[in-house]
Amino acid sequence: QAKEVATNRSFPPSGDAAVSAKVREANGFLPWYFNLPADEAKFAEAWKQAADSKGFSAPYGQPPAERRHPQFRSHGVGKCEWDGAIWPFATAQTLTAMANFINNYQVKPCALAVSSKGSLDMDSLYFNEMEKYVQSQSMRGKPYIGEYLDETTGYWLKGDQERSRYYNHSTFCDLIITGIVGLRPRADQTIEVRPIIPAGKWQYFCLDKVRYHGHDLTILYDQDGSRYHVG
């Protein structure tokens, strides 16, 4: 497991591979992007950091470095810093990894609060982070994906400068299709649909004309049948 995917329980070393970095980075979630870690509690515990406001849970998304570190957001602004501001593609990588963890792994991390019982509600965590992701991708009331944004205010740090406005680095559609709606890509001819929508959040949804393995699919949910009048 690549030296326990670092001695710091699932977060890899930087630089010298024999010495763990003194800061957790969101790149530590990337092994789940490829379903690499074993389905064991010692690796699952890493996801508690995605829910921790001192870890990677910020008001406008998942920063690339943990918020508790003393040098978080300390390297200035506007020079491609990766010390805490939100980069949409990095967030997308974390969310893809999280969806894989939810769908493909049985062992889940313990609840964040010491006093709580049971496991961390990963479905709610994913949905809440997706809501942040959706809300962040706008500027002046219009859809927008920029270079990177402030993790607490949602302000695009490079505004609409050319360098920023050409940063089309979101996998937004994939996150909706394979994560929220839950059409899970497969090599065989099985259609697997596993939405990540906590109870009570949505009363209906419809994803129409999705081309998949040579077929056009419609995936819909209607809580009481009054929206689409089918099924």
How should each PLM-predicted stretch be described?
Residues 3-10, 19-27:
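Aromatic- and carboxylate-enriched substrate-binding clefts and catalytic-loop regions
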Residues 12-13, 33:
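Accessory "access/gating" subregions that flank catalytic or transport cores
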Residues 15-17:
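Glycine-rich, charged/polar anion/phosphate-binding loops
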Residues 33-34, 178, 221:
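Hydrophobic side chains in beta-strands
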